Amino acid sequence: MLSRALVIALCLTIPSAGPDQKTSAKKSLEGVWKIVEIVTTGVDAATITSPQPSLAIFTKGHYSVLSVNGAEQRAQFAPPKDPNNLTDAEKIARYEQWSRFTANAGTYEVKGATLTRRPLVAKNETVMARNSSLASEFKLDGNTLWVTTKSEAGQPASETRTKLKRIE
């Protein structure tokens, strides 16, 4: 009789463990994070231990990521001589500053160790127009989050491991 009760208890408990773990991982992902290190292997290999400002926010099912890419501050530029008619040099200066900035937001889903983001709005039109998701592996350890992204099929092989620290 005891073994039958134990089997029934296990059957009732084990199926509910999966969703609770998923919910737990998703809840611990919720918060505000900043990038503290970026390591890229393969094409354009680099390690950035003092990244520029960033902010990643995860709520119940939505995310927003803003970051200045690279190890160097973005160059400042002088105000335009004629704001309605920028010179080629003024346009290039603005492009150089703007191209190093990442901004996108949308929905996300967690399945096991996979974080899948679906951008709804982005600075780069291509990111939101591609109608596909951005899948990364992730690992949480207390207030540290690692997100590992591999290059897409057809692109030169590389892997970027981004380390984030919880700030809220």
Language model features by range: what are they?
Residues 1-8:
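Sec-dependent signal peptide recognition
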Residues 11, 15-168:
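Lipid interaction determinants
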